[in-house]
Amino acid sequence: MAATEGRSLSHKEKVSISAALAAATCSLLGTTFPASADAQEAGDWDFNTSILYYGENDDRVKDYSVKSIARRMFVDDRSLSLGLTVDVLTGATPNGAIRQDVPQTFTRPSGSGFYTVPAGDLPLDDTFKDTRVALTANWQQPLGETSLVDVGGSVSKEYDYLHLGVNAKIARDFNQRNTTVSAGFAYSMDDLDPVGGAPTPLTPMLDVGDTSNRTGDQDKDVLDLVVGVTQVISRNLVVQANYSYSYSDGYLTDPYKVLSLVDGTTGDTLLRSGAIPAEGGPSHQFLFESRPDDRSKHSLYTQAKYYMDGKVLDISYRYMTDDWEIDSHTLELRYRWPLAGDHYIEPHVRYYTQTEAEFWRLSLDDSQPLPEYASADYRLGDFDATTLGLKYGWKTRNDHDMSVRLEWYQQSGDVPGEQIIGNQAGRDNYPDLDAIIVQFSFRF
């Protein structure tokens, strides 16, 4: 299809080209602006469902997820969207402690038991089991001929976590519907009830049954704001740019993460005085992590989609910076290649890189005063991640959309040289992570 300059696009042409870009803005807020009102008649229900498996190497985290979104059209282009997500998570996750040449014993988060990690192994907490149920609801309707508003709410529940949220977005067309400006917000109130209680930051892990350094429920609030513009350049090209701001306030610490307190010369974790691990208590000195109680994030996002003879090139870039001194870059590329009979394939490449938080530590040196904040959570460290994937999609005889997606995720991190002490130099301090993602989606 050759580019056609000098005329505005019809409403149907503009919807069909820019629909996928609208989802990128909404994903920042958790709102849902479905693809095309022209595909449904008033009174019809449209269902979009996916089943996903995510599995990490070395028997780490596994996620089995089912997600379904139902959308009903009403007269005058109004619509209601209802969403349900169920996640079942199992496996083991790093607890933050470093490897040692001797076995290490840890008190379980509940305080009612303990587990032992063999010498040389990465300390993993194998009590990572949870089920999350999330519900969303959004109402969308026009405001006049050129504006659209979407309002909604969300609730999700895990064993130790409750989320309540609201969101809203407004979008308006200009320039003969070739330019769309949008703005939105989301606000959430989250309540945390950690298993065994929330530990006092930077206090030691205690014996089984000793909860003297634990407190009760914690909470946090999160505000997200976004403004953006989508521009149709031609019949082949549409671009988008937006800016988002996120502010979190409250309990941002992970109550299940610890740091190793090490000898300032050898780098080995200090033994706990009088510890008898076989009787139920930590073998070494581990301190619970501490994070600031607020966080501000700024993000810039750009995306372009180019249509050429049925093929679609989709490229995007995101830059994020926050006051924890984390800077990240995300570059993503998709290329949709049509096949015969309404079939297609879509290769996918994603590259992500980030710097470590200013308070990230591999371990804590016992010869130095304790910092105000410290975390060994690898998610706050310096790492790069690459995702390679392939999606295969088709239409059924009943005109239903089906697709299968397979992706491989690889993450590798780096520890600043000045943080490595003594014997730590010979250990795998930031192990690589590999994961497989398989997803089956269908729409009817």
Q: For each of these PLM feature ranges, what is it?
A:
Residues 72-74, 141, 172-174, 231, ...:
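Residue-level signature of outer-membrane beta-barrel architecture
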Residues 83-135, 180-236, 246-249, 348-393, ...:
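Outer-membrane beta-barrel translocator/channel fold
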Residues 46-52, 83-85, 140, 150-154, ...:
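Transmembrane beta-strands of outer-membrane beta-barrel proteins
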Residues 60-64, 83, 93-99, 153-156, ...:
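Outer-membrane beta-barrel translocator domains and adjoining extracellular loop/strand segments
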Residues 62-66, 129-135, 162-166, 219-225, ...:
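Residues that define the transmembrane beta-barrel architecture of outer-membrane proteins
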Residues 51-55, 86-90, 153-159, 172-174, ...:
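Transmembrane beta-strands of outer-membrane beta-barrel pores
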